[in-house]
């Protein structure tokens, strides 16, 4: 039984009878019995109609209420996009009819739907469509479900489950907007009852705030390597797989889920065999990591090949994406895909503007001397640590660092409402001058994703990328390092902590800063 407005209206009229008739099967049902309750759940008779969650407005409201000092750049209105000049190819990609508005001057040519300019226009259209269309009793508080009651299914065609586990289920489905078909991903994932209750009061888990930040990076054309998030719903009775301890069999359980609708990708990074493709993937991932580190102090905490997706795009010879970073242009060849940094479920921010408590371990300052970046260590006099009741206590002096000279250096940990008494002024909002140890961990996960090694935060290990080219491996291996929070940060290895510096170290040797002759520039991105 799925939601049907006419049948639910009929149910509303007869549900209080002693033996009401099921409007879906025309059979009598026992009042307050299991079938009766299921019909009530589907029709949600006792809930006032609601609207789809507008992620942008709610996250901005959350920011304004909780962190008024955070400044997120306002997205510019999507420009009318000119198609890049391309040489004709004997292999033509199927072109859908023009999109999206009633104004013929603002059509979107889906032949170039992989460009960020087009993706931003499509995102706005899809978000508006979902907000306007999915807006009736189906999605009222806690009843927007892909599994179990399946109240959302009627809005999509060709729905397929493409991933399933204890976290929930990932679906892909199509929506039709003005005779143009778009595929989107729908993630139905388990959340706690506490998170669900907070969400209904518009107090969203921080992951949703991060999704909004990724949308802003995309809308401001800084970096294309994130998924657009369109909207978020909640389901009080979703069905997920529940693993039984010491039993190989599994069964499903009914729980509470968030249902997040996002831009669809095609696969993870498995299958990259050419040197150009491997280098392009490395550049794109490091560019995305640089954005989240510098702008928001976000530590991803789970970068691995399964969490970097791939959006396949058409390619032709001599096509490039231009990235502007620190005053230098990098020309990244179009190798047939856009890499997407995905899954911020365990991420957190150490920015004082966002974090509610922890501002990170910062053992050194980045200085620029003799045309190179170097670390300059500093010390603190006090060290915060939480007791078993969660109260911050002071440890003086702080723990010392390991290695030659470490006895004179301290482990510098910063937290909200705690003065660590540093020996120099520390700007906790400047992640380029005062990086955190977590930034090193993210970058190590990126390079180890290619050459192999232990994951830095999560349990498990990266395996070497299958088919990794010797030139790529040789370029990456020098930047694999094993540091602990109590290690002395290597003076001449700032690139281990700053993704932008690592980009320059690796990609100048492959000629990425040299403008290719007669290059077709598909799009330009201005990294922060």
Swiss-Prot record:
Keywords from the named record: ATP-binding, Kinase, Nucleotide-binding, Serine/threonine-protein kinase, Transferase
Active site: 302
Keyword Cell membrane carried by entry: no
Database matches in PROSITE patterns: PROTEIN_KINASE_ATP (PS00107), PROTEIN_KINASE_DOM (PS50011)
GO biological process assignments: intracellular signal transduction
SUPFAM superfamilies (UniProt xref): Protein kinase-like (PK-like)
Broad enzyme group: transferase
Domain Protein kinase: from-to ranges: 156-507
Region (Disordered): 70-96
Biased composition (Basic residues): 73-95
Signal peptide start and end residues: none
Catalytic activity: L-seryl-[protein] + ATP = O-phospho-L-seryl-[protein] + ADP + H(+); L-threonyl-[protein] + ATP = O-phospho-L-threonyl-[protein] + ADP + H(+)
Annotated ATP binding sites: 162-170, 187
GO function terms (MF aspect): ATP binding; histone H3T3 kinase activity; protein serine kinase activity
E.C. numbers: 2.7.11.1
Family, as annotated: Belongs to the protein kinase superfamily. Ser/Thr protein kinase family.
Name of this chain's protein: Probable serine/threonine-protein kinase 380R
Protein source organism: Invertebrate iridescent virus 6
